[in-house]
Curated annotation (Swiss-Prot):
Domain of life: Bacteria
Originating gene: insB1
Name used for this protein in its record: Insertion element IS1 protein InsB
Role this protein plays: Absolutely required for transposition of IS1.
UniProt xrefs under InterPro entries: Transposase_27 (IPR005063), Transposase_27_IS1 (IPR051354)
Pfam families referenced in this protein's UniProt entry, alphabetically: DDE_Tnp_IS1
GO MF term set: DNA binding; transposase activity
Keyword tags: DNA recombination, Transposable element, Transposition
Keyword Protein transport: no
Annotated organism of origin: Shigella flexneri
GO biological process, one term: DNA transposition
Family: Belongs to the transposase 27 family.
């Protein structure tokens, strides 16, 4: 059971900034760890994939930013929309940018293939959160 889960999306790119790649993930506010993540476009389909991974957990309270798809998809659940209550996951986004140069906004380091981009970030999350 997860008492409080923060959900957010993190922007990245592959090859050129026009080829966007989004990391959607959920962060357990109490345990301070990433619970699940998926890569894809910033669409409802990617959000649905993340929520299907999270269906195994019983999440009591969802905390998200103001992206409208969160509100429409989490209707009927205890859902808090606030920047104040997503500060931990936003801090984690900053940590990702600091630890992985390819996620920096203005960097000479960038991913050249989608497969490698997903594997490097997935491996980092696996080492830091899933083990």
């Amino acid at each position: 059971m997860i008492v409080c889960a923060e959900m957010d999306e993190h922007w990245g790119y592959v090859g050129a900034k026009s080829r966007q790649r989004w990391l959607f993930y959920a962060y357990d506010r109490i345990r301070r760890t990433v619970v699940a993540h998926v890569f894809g476009e910033r669409t409802l389909a990617t959000l649905e994939r993340l929520l299907s991974l999270l269906s195994a957990f019983e999440v009591v309270v969802w905390m998200t930013d103001g992206w409208p798809l969160y509100e429409s998809r989490l209707k009927g659940k205890l859902h808090v929309i606030s920047k104040r209550y997503t500060q931990r996951i936003e801090r984690h986004n900053l940590n990702l940018r600091q630890h992985l140069a390819r996620l920096g906004r203005k960097s000479l380091s960038f991913s050249k293939s989608v497969e490698l981009h997903d594997k490097v970030i997935g491996h980092y999350l696996n080492i830091k959160h899933y083990q």
